[in-house]
Design a protein with these regions (language model features):
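Disulfide-bonded cysteine-rich modules in secreted/extracellular proteins
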Residues: 1, 58-72
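Beta-loop motif signature
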Residues: 1-41
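Loop/turn positions that initiate beta-strands
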Residues: 27, 121-122
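SH3/SH3-like beta-barrel fold
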Residues: 40-44, 146
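Boundary regions of SH3-family modules and the immediately adjacent low-complexity/disordered segments
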Residues: 43-63
């Protein structure tokens, strides 16, 4: 994503080109009205809109994660041919420029910024799945869907955050600082 933001008292100007998203120019934007979880709220002639200045980073995370669909789950592995859930996270984010170390789910949970409004590329954490406390994680894709290294039976698969099993074990959403 190419991005440049120039703000003045009134009006504010934005020029942004998103990956597969909408282009915004200074003529279309009246005011940058604030941010929420890294998204910019802008007021344009067409009404309120949201843009993500980090969309290219997020799309890289999701693109690499989706390329791993169907790969096997192997406990303790962190790619590129097999993964456990935290190894999957490590592989995808590390290969997208995030400075993180290989850790367990319980180790990642205290490192992330806790959020309530997940965006694609954020993390989904589950607890008490096979051990007490934070024990499973995946990458949020949007619309309640996430991708994760599920089990030896499933490998890397898509899942639904709102399934009864995941809701029973849901811990929260998180976001890595880059």
């Amino acid at each position: 994503m190419e991005k440049s933001f120039y703000t003045y008292n009134e009006p504010s100007f934005v020029s942004a080109k998103g990956n597969g998203g909408q282009d915004f120019s200074a003529q279309e934007v009246l005011v940058i009205d604030g941010t929420t979880s890294g998204w910019l709220k802008i007021i344009s002639y067409e009404g309120e809109k949201w843009i993500n200045p980090n969309a290219s980073e997020v799309s890289g995370v999701i693109e690499l994660a989706l390329k791993q669909l169907g790969k096997p789950y192997v406990f303790g592995e962190s790619g590129p041919n097999s993964f456990d859930c935290s190894g999957f996270i490590y592989y995808v984010y590390k290969n997208n420029g995030y400075s993180i170390s290989r850790n367990s789910v319980a180790g990642y949970w205290p490192m992330v910024i806790k959020i309530n409004d997940p965006q694609p590329g954020d993390l989904v954490f589950l607890q008490n799945t096979y051990t007490p406390g934070p024990s499973h994680m995946g990458i949020y894709l949007g619309n309640g869907e996430f991708i994760h290294a599920g089990s030896e039976q499933t490998g890397v698969v898509r899942g639904n955050v709102f399934s009864s099993y995941n809701q029973k074990h849901f811990l929260g959403y998180g976001r890595f600082k880059k």
